Amino acid sequence: MSTIIDVKNLTKKYGDLTAVDAISFSVNSGETFGILGPNGAGKTTTLEMIEGLKGITSGQVLLDGINVHERPRDVKAIIGVQLQSSSFFDGLSLKELLETFGALYGRRVDAMSLLEKVQLVEKAKSQVKELSGGQKQRLSIAVGLVNDPKVLFLDEPTTGLDPQARRNLWDLITSIKKSGTTVVLTTHYMEEAEVLCDRVAIMDHAKIMKLDTPTNLLRNSGVDSTIEFHVDKKCAVDHFKSLAGVAQATEEDHTFRLISTNPEETLPALFAHEKEHGFNIFNLQLRQATLEDVFLKLTGRSLRE
């Protein structure tokens, strides 16, 4: 599989603040590549440097063999970037909007075909202000496709959407990938990364902590299961850290979470601990590891923090 993006020691500093710290990775042609991390991790800055929209402090980005920061105009001709709805021209219909963006690339655009691809044909004569949040996001992706890009960049594409609109957008992104377009996206939704991405880079505090397929990240994390529960008395989380099989114990919003490498050992130990210390456990759930758990083990905090 050929490499379409090659990032080497990419760094961005603002005075004493390091926003992106010497990260390196590659993206394969035709894959959906995700950068997963909380707000402030450096995801958007990384994307903007790869797109050529933000200068770099040091390092190098090659996109389809082109040095992004030496030949930014050549790069912009082969990439698509998701725009925010505030970037759109007021007073134009969706059809006129796509044709206008096409003209900026010197291309004659089949606007209706693009609108069909993003399931907005019935809104062709509407203006952006008349669209729902999910429809605006689909339009922004259509704009990113006007130049038939080799790589489409999506920055937090489903933030703020309701669950159904989010899943509709996932279907759209999957169809774009199936058409042969490489997709690079950032997200702080672990389920989104698991569903959409062939490979995921977990990013925190300006660094890439781990990079692999979602399956391998889960398999090699050393995290097999998570036990979540509430108790009817005030308990310190330290109560549970020494239980058999517990790799990590945390408490958030009155929910205790035990990351266990062996739940068959941990559960009996937990129930014995309950009996010994005179509290009652309720709302107990046992679930398989997710990328949220992998992130927690790597960083010691949740994606929401």
Label each residue range with its predicted role.
Residues L98, A111, P214, V237, ...:
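Generic structural marker for isolated residues within well-ordered, non-membrane alpha-helices
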Residues M1-T11, R301-E305:
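ABC-family P-loop ATPase nucleotide-binding domain
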Residues R73, L218, L296:
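A short local structural element in Rossmann-fold oxidoreductases
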Residues G80, G102, G106, A201, ...:
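A generic structural signal for secondary-structure junctions
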Residues I4-I5, K12-K210:
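ABC transporter nucleotide-binding domains
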Residues D171-T261:
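ABC transporter nucleotide-binding domain
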Residues V223-R301, E305:
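Short, charged/small-residue-rich alpha-helical element at the C-terminal edge
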